[in-house]
Every structure is written in structure tokens, then in C-alpha cells.
Amino acid sequence: MLHAEFLWDFLTGIIHGSTISQAQEDIIDQIFDASDIIVEFILLLKKEIPNIKTYFCYGNHGRTTQGKSDAANKSNYERIIPAYVRKELRKNDIKVIDGGYEDFVTYKLRDGKLIVCTHGTNDHPDTVNKNFTKLLGENVYEIHMGHYHSVKEGNGATVNGSIMGSDDYSISKRFHNQPAQVLKVYYGNDDVGTFKLVLKN
């Protein structure tokens, strides 16, 4: 079973002036293109791994307003993408699961261990596992999150990299990273392999 997690940000969005001017597409075209790329990617995976479940949680780049304090959690362009992907994959036996209005989604491994997927806008990697364990009232085995655009692991959390690397905004804040993704393999009995896949064009 492959659990494919889409932790966002797949849209440049409208939250930073620099990324608006840097984007070569408006937000609507970004939604269509990102959705099509995700569908194509999932279908490529299915050719190699027949049993796939996909999980979507939205991030901060899809906010419908620039001001963070003005943004309601559910007012997010990225919520459109799983609906589009679900419709495109309806003739396949691929599950498309999203958190609805919540910015996280959960699933369990074969041995019953709880995994929480979240973008991470509202979380810190050092405390997120403890906070979700309290929130859900259940022991969380691992948190998988994005947002920080750099691979990190520890304290019951794995931070995924970004497929785009650094944009003008992140460079202006002196953040830098290589485009990368994380592949985790659960062998059983707490034996877990974590692989950092550095992306090159």
C-alpha cells in the first residue's frame, strides 16, 4: 500500500507581493495546472504500485487573502484541488482523502499506528506531535508536515521538502534549500526507512 501525501504548497498564490509578480500564471490557471500534474503523477505511480491512497491537506499559499490575520482556515484555493483530482480519478480505484475544512488529515498504518498529515502553517516541528496527541486524544505515531520547505526529522515529526526550492520571498528571508521530497518506508516493528529524494531538473 502506498500512502501518497500532498502537504502543499502547490500554488504560488496571492499571499506575498513578490510571488504574485514572480508567478507566470494567475491563481485559477495555477489550480488547473497543479491539479492536472497531480493526476498525471498519481496515474504514473499506479502503473508501478496498484494499491494507492492519497491524502490532501491545504497550506498557507492558497489563502484567499494576503493578510494572515484576515484569513479563515477554510477560505483557501487549495481546497479545490482534491475535488478536481477526485473527479478525474473517479474511474480508478484510487482513494482521494482530504480534511475538508480542517488543515490536517489522518490515517493508520497496517499495525494501527496513527499518522497525521498537515501543512504545518500553525505548527512547530518540535511540538506538533505532542499538540496533535492532545487534540485528537490518541497517541500520534508520526506527524508528516511541509511549510518549512526543508527536510527535517525528529520529535515524532517529519518535515517534507519543497518541490520548488527557494522563491524570491524565501530568499529575502534568507531561507534556502534544495528541492526535495521524503519517502518513508514502514517495515514493521518500528523499523522505518526515511529517504530524502533531492530533485534535479
List each language-model region with its residue ranges.
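Conserved beta-sheet core of the metallophosphoesterase superfamily
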Residues: 46, 75-79, 84-92, 97-101, ...
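Short, solvent-exposed loop/turn elements at beta->coil junctions and helix N-caps
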Residues: 104
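Core catalytic region of metal-dependent phosphoesterases/phosphodiesterases
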Residues: 1-88
